[in-house]
């Protein structure tokens, strides 16, 4: 009876250790995924900022040209 309890205790202990190792690996994998999403989001934000600044530059040059032609100072 004692040997049976001892072996069950060892199995429980080993199962607990393997479960905690699996959880650590899963958490490490999830952290990598979050980093990738942040990088993608950062790249998309940079592209968006670049597009907005380019559009502002084009709009400003068009307004300058239009005001020059309206004032007949070109």
Swiss-Prot record:
Pfam families: Antimicrobial_2, FSAP_sig_propep. The keyword Secreted applies. One of its GO terms (cellular component) is extracellular region. Keywords: Amphibian defense peptide, Antibiotic, Antimicrobial, Cleavage on pair of basic residues, Cytolysis, Disulfide bond, Fungicide, Hemolysis, Secreted, Signal. Belongs to the frog skin active peptide (FSAP) family. Brevinin subfamily. Antimicrobial peptide active against a variety of Gram-positive and some Gram-negative bacterial strains. Has antifungal activity against a slime mold isolate. Has hemolytic activity against human erythrocytes. Residues 1-22 form the signal peptide. Residues 23-39 form a propeptide. Its main location: secreted. This is Brevinin-2CG1. Coiled coil: none annotated. The keyword Signal applies. It comes from the Eukaryota. InterPro entries: Antimicrobial_frog_2, Frog_antimicrobial_propeptide. It is found in: Secreted. Disulfide bonds join 68-74. Expressed by the skin glands. GO terms for biological process: defense response to bacterium; defense response to fungus; killing of cells of another organism.
């Amino acid at each position: 009876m004692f040997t049976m309890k001892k072996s069950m205790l060892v199995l429980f202990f080993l199962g607990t250790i393997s479960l905690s190792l699996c959880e650590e690996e899963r958490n490490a994998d999830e952290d990598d995924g979050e980093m990738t999403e942040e990088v993608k989001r950062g790249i998309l934000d940079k592209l968006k900022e670049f597009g907005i600044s380019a559009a502002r530059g084009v709009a400003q040059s068009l307004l300058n040209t239009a005001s020059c032609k309206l004032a007949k100072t070109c």
